[in-house]
Curated annotation (Swiss-Prot), chains A, B:
The reaction(s) this protein catalyses: (2S)-2-phospholactate + GTP + H(+) = (2S)-lactyl-2-diphospho-5'-guanosine + diphosphate
Keyword Plastid annotated: no
A GO BP entry: F420-0 metabolic process
Keyword annotations of the record: GTP-binding, Nucleotide-binding, Nucleotidyltransferase, Transferase
Pfam family of the protein (one): CofC
Protein name (record): 2-phospho-L-lactate guanylyltransferase
HAMAP family listed in its UniProt record: CofC
Role played: Guanylyltransferase that catalyzes the activation of (2S)-2-phospholactate (2-PL) as (2S)-lactyl-2-diphospho-5'-guanosine, via the condensation of 2-PL with GTP. It is involved in the biosynthesis of coenzyme F420, a hydride carrier cofactor.
Complexes and interactors: Homodimer.
The EC number(s) this enzyme carries: 2.7.7.68
Metabolic or biological pathway, per its Swiss-Prot or TrEMBL entry: Cofactor biosynthesis; coenzyme F420 biosynthesis
Domain of life of the organism encoding this protein: Archaea
Length: 215, 215
């Protein structure tokens, strides 16, 4: 089965909730490293990758569409172009593997979906993308389940820690350092001086070697 | 295959990180509701449940051992008693299902493990429990992987959002309200006036109807 993976990506000033520990240049490099991890998994699973970018961007192994409208409008524009099944996958879930994506595309339902933490949606696979519309922001998982019902789609919810782990906050970096063996994003963090640290209550967080800071 | 599920449980003043929204009596009732969800999944999967309690506690459908030593010592004492495979499962992962537990106990490896968020360990299944020792607190997932290696165990890491979601903080309640259909813990939260709410940035959180507060 041939299909496209649609990956929204913000190349300029992304991941602002990480500003407390990464400056803009670093956040841009880190977001690209996570994107590489996602693209690698997508391509290994047999999909072609199309990046929906807010700004001009080049990538050797992916098509790029620059769209300046809000995220939902950009995705819905793209879905309207597709005559084959489509995967909408976020660029900030670097723990995803090709095998994980296979779990979605092998669904017997019309649609499969992976919730993100906190009510979000991290991946949607659609056999008939033109019938669907995306509604990200807020409790998008519930919104997407409702929209699927309105479309008359049968839905499989995929249970996965790796795919549900989107990286937004400092605490999320722990997951990459612990579970991200072999990932470009982990390499980036390690080369930038990040490591696991325990606070006085034994809770796990990250620390940064001050010699590696460019802030 | 016959085996025991070992569930550590603190009946008195549990879940103190929820003190900002639940008083002690409420936290005790909520912890019991989550425990009921876990016990229901455990029993439906064909296991018997043994609670390792810090204080005196009674339960109709589970054996209770009151152990006043620290958590790791209590678990390691219990593992030493077992001559059959054992599951160590936390009482604060109410999204777990019987099918999820089956994924662990059907492993072909010597051990299967489910990481929790933030470096923790939420479930361990051990075919030879007497050889193992638990080391919770801190980055316990990495510690348990190391201990398994020292024991010469082959290990399967199970990828699951539901099982990796332990409920510690106010933000975690979102997961129960969104994904916890049919759970006792969700019923408790709803009856206590909790519902999903969006903040001004569109992020999902919980709110509580002030009429339902007993604080």
């Amino acid at each position: 089965m041939y299909f496209h993976a649609l990956i929204p990506f913000k190349p300029v000033n992304p991941k602002t909730r990480l500003s407390c520990i990464l400056n803009q240049e670093e956040r841009e490099a880190f977001a690209r490293a996570m994107l590489e991890d996602v693209i690698a998994a997508v391509q290994k699973s047999g999909c072609s990758a199309t990046l929906l970018c807010t700004h001009s961007f080049k990538h050797e192994n992916a098509l790029v569409a620059v769209r300046t409208e809000p995220l939902n409008d950009a995705i819905n524009w793209a879905l309207g172009q597709f005559h084959c099944p489509a995967l909408i996958i976020m660029g900030d879930i670097p723990l995803v593997t090709a095998g994980d994506i296979q779990r979605l595309i092998r669904t017997e339902k019309d649609m499969s979906i992976v919730p993100g933490r906190g009510g979000g949606t991290n991946i949607i696979f659609l056999k008939k993308p033109r019938c669907f519309r995306a509604d990200y922001y807020g409790a998008s998982f519930l919104d997407h389940m409702r929209i699927a019902e309105e479309c008359g789609f049968s839905v499989e919810v995929i249970d996965s820690f790796r795919m549900s782990t989107d990286i937004d906050e400092k605490e999320d970096l722990v997951e990459i350092l612990i579970h991200g063996k072999g990932r470009r994003s982990r390499e980036y963090l390690e080369n930038s001086g990040f490591s696991i640290a325990l606070d006085e209550k034994g809770r796990v967080g990250v620390q940064r070697d001050p010699h590696e800071e460019a802030l």
